[in-house]
Amino acid sequence: MDMTTTIILSIAVFLGIVLLLVALLLLVRNKLMPKGEVRITINDDKELTVPVGNTLINTLAEQKVYLASACGGKGSCGQCKCRVVEGGGTILPTEVGFFTRKQIQDHWRLGCQVKVKENLKIVVLQSILNVKEYECTVVSNCNVATFIKEFKVQLPEGEHMDFIPGSYAQIKIPKFDIKYADFDKELIGNEYLPSWEKFNMFDLRCVNTEPTVRAYSMANYPAEGDVFMLTVRIATPPFKPDHSSFMNVNPGIASSYIFSLKPGDKVLMSGPYGEFHVKEHDNGNVGPSTGSGTLLPEMIWVGGGAGMAPLRAQIMHLTRTLNVRDREMHYFYGARALNEVFYLDDFRQLEKDFPNFHFHLALDHPDPAADAAGVPYTPSFVHNVMYDTYLKDHRAPEDIEYYMCGPGPMSAAVVNMLDNLGVPPENIMYDDFGGGAPTK
């Protein structure tokens, strides 16, 4: 047997072994992979017949039951919580950190971590069953600050969504390859373009290789019609250590997608989600106070950046819709400079129309533009402004209701300050759809 024949036979034997192993793997996979259909019973009421093999969150979404998810089902936000009272196996290590011992005993799970392999009985919030998905049309998408857009979409004709101010929506993000150079510069605006050019923003590119979803708080309140209105901050890569340019990593997937959209574009949105709502008193009353003679607690909102969204919705609903005039209300908002503050005119007008409402602006540093415009502000971080200008001399800060949404460091500083003032945790409400409320 010559050398050529030996080589050919060796290759043939090798390929035969590889093909045999592949066939065995496919056979084993076919035997081990679950097949067929199972039943999912929801709240002892609704029963679904579904195929096996997918995660619970995706299986339910295919049946138009939408669990909340701010991370696209990656197990990092902890929002897709539900009780799996039958089936589903034991809780996974990836889930444990999101629940207390009592919740684990009560069978709480993350929908993105539960595989549908057998019949399941689950319990979800009733509000989840009211969530719908809509194909919406972009109405406007203009910058309201250097790196923040007001993104507004219209629900389809004939559709209506009931929601409580402070709720959030989810947007479906498709696969894409987006170059920031293709962004519509008119939608960014001449006021903000110099900063974009200074930081070489138009050199960035974002690639998304698989569909996902992201969550954003709604800035609109019900009286503004059948729309979703979000405030979205572009998530840039971190700077290199020498601050010469951005690191070569992907910018934010969802914010890049939203910033690329133009009026007339179609997007898939679902909602409403969330429990960041104004506390109810006296059988559902949030204000005005009832005729019992007892005033409802004072309210303080504190926000920064795109965290403006749910706070605006709550404040506008209480004032413009419910006409609450006998609850003391204060809104503390922090920004780097005056040109980063949006909806300012709305809140200054509220101060004129509602003597019980007060807007407090905190800017990081003295701002000549604010001084020239005659806009009242205090130069400091927002938690310091809250304490120094109001809470320090307040007779009972522990009785106030606090509503908070903004960057993590801001929230942590505010919580620490309120904790030192003796404010109980139940009086501090967070917009926490992104996972992880501030800790002390």
What residue spans do the PLM features occupy?
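Fe-S ferredoxin-like electron-transfer domains
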Residues: 21-27, 31, 97-154, 159
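Reductase modules of NAD(P)H-dependent flavoproteins
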Residues: 2-73, 84-105, 276, 320, ...
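Short coil-to-beta-strand transition motifs
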Residues: 127-136, 207-214, 341
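Short, charged beta-turn/beta-strand-edge "cap" motif at the junction between a beta-strand
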Residues: 116, 128, 175-178, 271-276
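A short, basic/flexible loop-to-alpha-helix module at the beginning of a structural domain
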Residues: 257, 271-295, 392
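Cysteine-centered iron-sulfur cluster-binding motifs in ferredoxin-type domains/subunits
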Residues: 69-78, 111-115
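Ferredoxin-reductase
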Residues: 139-265, 289, 336, 363-366
